[in-house]
Each structure stands twice: as structure tokens, then as C-alpha cells.
Amino acid sequence: MCGIAGILREDVDLREQEQLLCQMSDSLRSRGPDDSGRYLEPGAALLHRRLAIIDPAGGRQPMRFGDLVIAYNGEIYNTAQVRHLLESAGYSFETTCDTEVVLKAYHKWKAGCLEKLNGIFAFAVYDTRRGTLFAARDRIGVKPLFYCKKGRLFAFASRIPTLLLLPEVEPVVDRSGLAEIFMLGPARSPGHAVFRDLAEIGRAHV
């Protein structure tokens, strides 16, 4: 289990948001107590908290390959097979972790990489040249990934409390989301969150 988060915006220099980024990272500590990392530029920040299981030395995140930076949480069951396909296509690997496999799978197949991956995951890939973000979850939706899109702000995180740290997000309960909790018990409709301005990337969605 790991924790990921990120912010994209053009109206604020994120390099000047050190306190906010530290708070967001700290809020994910329960999902990744072993290590923390970040990628930061004026308009984008990716955060990662790691529970180190595979390749503790080589699997630090966010991980970069060319123009792409990934923050990843998950487990790929067919890592060896996907890695073999990529090696056959000319890719080489510096680590034994599945993060590098997912990153290079996206580099090779873009969104089509999801058809190759068998596992449970939530990840986001930021293209530093184009300034775009690709985020996705597994088919079952085991790994959580929530997001906020408000004005010129887009942010995502493994946990709702992480997004509630954003000054633009007020901790106001969404009445329809709360009604679902009361009617369905602990369940809720896929893609919904309990707080206003927040939503969840649906299972098998990008």
C-alpha cells in the first residue's frame, strides 16, 4: 500500500507552496511510512508515500522516464510478461519494481497500457513537455483515487483528507453523497465522494 497525490495549476507557483505540499504528504503517511518523494515544477506537483516491499533501493517515486513522471500505487500480477513485451520492443530496466514497468508501458502504449496490465492499481503520469496528466484505476477499483477540479485547479489523492487540505476545498458534505451512505450503508455509487467539489475516479476509468 502506498499513497499518491498531485496538483496541477497555472495560476500559482507550486514551488512556493512548501507548507501545503508537506501537509499533503504527511496526510498520506499511514499509506506509506517507509519513504516519501516529490516531483515539483511551477505548475505541477506529484507526491508519493511509499510502503517499500519490492526493490526498496530502486523503487523510489515519483519516478521519471524521459518527459514522463509517475506516481503509482498498486501491484501488477503480470509484471514479468509486460516487462518481457517491453524488452522485446527495445526497452531496458534499471529496477525490479513494477512502477518502472507501468511507466514504460504507458510510454509505449499510452492509455492502451491498461489493456496490458493485470493487477490492482491507481496511478498518475504527468507529461512534463505537454503539461498534461493521465490518471487511471484498475478494473475492480481496489486502489482509491479521488480528485478535485475547481476553476484552474486540478488535484488528486489516495485519500479524501489530503484534498481537504487545499484552501479551495471546503469540508462541506454533499447531501446526495450523504444520502447514499444512509440508504446503502457503507457503500456509495462509484465515482461519488461524500464532500462537495470532490469525486472519485471510477473503477476501470481514466
Task: Report each predicted region and the residues it spans.
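Cysteine-centered catalytic environments shared across enzyme families
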Residues: M1-R203
